[in-house]
């Protein structure tokens, strides 16, 4: 569950893709800050209190026992998960194509272990996996009010797959993969990229149909 605390918006207006992008950027910043603090104070006996103070998590500093509330929330989340259709995003053809791409790249790494130390290969693999994860996030919800969120995640998936394309081109320039391997990579990468672009257009059209051009 994503916390929207501290993010101001118009309560009566559905968020569009730009509202969601701003929100996701804020979450990225908070995650980066948390990871930096965790690394800095990893061995400090007062680590949790220090991080809570730095992150502004005042409820954790008040000494309140949140165990029962957390357990209740987990039970609610579990009930919601059981009520939802299983693996809905995994059935989407675009997600399957993105996942198949990551499997193909893994197999290429298995065939040539030296690629694992190549920055261009790491860029290719990392961003292909990231694109797959962003697609999973985009395709997991069918809520009308979350069309903007879906588009925002699709745009992030598009950025990731574009960086993977750059990584593939660099590997060819560096002669770390063959022309034939690059051709297969491009076919798979562009299949995912074009699918993302098509989906963004479809969701934007649905947004305009439901909410107008605002």
Where are these regions (language model features)?
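Amphipathic alpha-helical assembly/interaction segments
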Residues: 2-214
């Amino acid at each position: 569950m994503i916390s929207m605390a501290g993010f101001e918006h118009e309560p009566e207006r559905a968020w569009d893709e730009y509202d969601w992008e701003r929100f996701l950027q804020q979450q990225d910043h908070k995650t980066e800050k948390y990871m930096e603090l965790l690394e800095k104070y990893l061995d400090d006996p007062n680590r949790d209190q220090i991080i809570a103070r730095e992150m502004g998590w005042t409820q954790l500093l008040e000494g309140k026992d949140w165990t029962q509330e957390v357990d209740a929330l987990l039970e609610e989340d579990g009930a919601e998960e059981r009520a939802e259709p299983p693996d809905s995003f995994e059935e989407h053809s675009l997600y399957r194509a993105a996942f198949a791409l990551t499997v193909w790249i893994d197999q290429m790494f298995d065939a040539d272990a030296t690629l694992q130390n190549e920055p261009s290969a790491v860029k290719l693999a990392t961003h292909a996996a990231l694109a797959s994860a962003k697609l999973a996030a985009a395709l997991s919800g069918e809520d009308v009010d979350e069309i903007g969120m879906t588009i925002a995640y699709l745009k992030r998936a598009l950025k990731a797959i574009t960086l993977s394309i750059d990584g593939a081109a660099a590997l060819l320039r560096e002669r770390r993969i063959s022309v034939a391997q690059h051709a297969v990579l491009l076919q798979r990468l562009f299949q995912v990229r074009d699918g993302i672009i098509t989906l963004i257009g479809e969701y934007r059209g649905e947004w305009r149909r439901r909410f107008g051009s605002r």
